[in-house]
């Protein structure tokens, strides 16, 4: 997968580079839809979205407990972002991202 630089994130994912100010890590919650739908048929798609939401919520709760800022970003170009992080789109795709380390607003 390799390293994704600040510039790559801005051009391939975020339009507002200010969102990355103070960010220590970017977590991408992604899914391999071939895996989930093979086991659960069409429900696999819904399950993946639910699980991503649960994981993001748990990350928010942990960050709040630790006093760490976190921002969830779900609005991005799926194909461009998948290419940036080497996912085999559309079978693999990012569902949401968490920018961790931002100061609390």
Per-region residue spans from a language model:
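Acidic, surface-exposed loops and disordered segments
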Residues: 1-105
